[in-house]
Amino acid sequence: MIFGKMKSLLAVLALALLLAPAAQAAPAKLSSAWMGEHETFVAWYAKQQGWDKEAGLDLTMMPFDSGKNIVESLAAYDWAVAGCGAVPALSTPLSDYLYIIAVANDESANNAIYVRKDSPILGAKGTNPSYPNVYGSAVTVQKADILYPKSTSAHYLLATWLRILGLSEKDVKLQEMEPTPALSAFTGGVGDAVALWAPLTYEAEAKGFKSVANSKDCGITQLVLLVANRRFADQHPEQVQAFLKMYMRGIEALRAKPAKELAVDYVRFYKEWTGRELTPEMAVADIQSHPVFTLDEQLAMFAPGGSVQKALNEIVDFSISHGSFTPEQIDKMKGKTQVAARFLEAIK
């Protein structure tokens, strides 16, 4: 009888040893690419809480200066997921290798064009009656020297602003420059205007620069998207879904907690990611000015005829007018074959 009990005990121990590796399996490493801004804070905050590990992931986060650089880095860094603006997600050459899997936020109020406080551009407002809050005129903006990041949301805003004023990019002098060095150059006296996105917009305002146009006042929607490496997502859909669960948990935290409570973490995040200072007041403003969307809201946005489709249609038109695309590429962009709502649908 004792021998029988020992055999049973040994069998239980053997089974426990077999199951232990599965129970203690290391989280899957998931590489990701981001900019030092709002959508990245959501992922950073979720990782700080350990929510990536709870989702079975070990999220690594690589920093970049722009969404264009993120997409162009895909071949070199082979990241799995990323956050970037809709313009580079749709129009950058490697965008064919991406899926659009979710919306990180709406940054329409946070892309803006700045001038110095003595700029003649501030002397005219609402010259186009359809856009009463937009500054500038064909006379004051023509031949202006403008610093901007090409093929980005800020470029989309710049082109729209010029169109509102009856101008085109041929009517001004454009200097292609990433936002951080562009703000430094503008501060040093280079250029007549600079196109930026948040949180650099708050730094521009702190320096006394004045906004003459933002995306919201210009009537365009600027969505920041979550994208996935198409090859990786096809091979590991469960990891992409786990990432979305983690990110949606971060969005729920932003919706539930007052911005003032999150500001301390946001200031720390910004310092870690950019090496630059952000005041608690700026952090609160940035959190409050970036709407984020729950899973149910996102599913509605991604539905046929939803707001995502409308916003992407407008950006496709902009991208086609500003790029050299083959008919096949144009058909792909118009067909929005990159949009993959199935990853969101899988985590309902």
Positions of predicted regions on the chain:
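Extracytoplasmic/secreted envelope proteins and their assembly/folding machinery
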Residues: T40, V71, A86-A89, H155, ...
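Pocket-lining segment of extracytoplasmic ligand-binding domains
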Residues: P181-E272
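Bacterial N-terminal signal peptides that target proteins for export
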Residues: M1-A11
